[in-house]
Amino acid sequence: MVIYHAIKGVDEAGNPDQTSGELVRLIGENCHTVVADNEIAERYSRHLKKLLSIPSLLYKTTDFLSEVIYNSSKFVVEECPAPELPPGVRVPREDEYIVRAALISHPIIVTAEDRVLKAVSRESVLALIALTPAEALELAKDT
């Protein structure tokens, strides 16, 4: 989860890396928005509650909550239910909720999960774009 990586200051392998943190900072500063459906918003909430219980991450987590999650211009929860995947589309079962949520309004999916990146790029019928945090950071810098 990119937000988890941003707050902890690590990459998907747990190595020190500020890419996700820089991306979240840019989202907070410019016109970009985090879009989620109810399921993703609930998962964010659970992860953030865990991070709030870690004293060394309290400041970064609280900052993220105030800059993004509690800011209605930066965090939008789509209320309509996520559609089913089109027939024949294959994505890893554990990541299906991410792809289905993106089918609501077609935001850019930002993920460090290689399996999600590959599935989205392989299934062109979805008409979705998935980027790594580093790719999204470059895009955020340009806009």
What are these regions (language model features)?
Residues 70-108, 119-121:
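Active-site neighborhoods of divalent-metal-dependent phosphate/nucleic-acid chemistry enzymes
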Residues 25-31, 38-84:
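PIN-domain endoribonuclease scaffold, especially VapC-family toxins
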Residues 6-8, 44-48, 120-122:
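A short acidic (Asp/Glu
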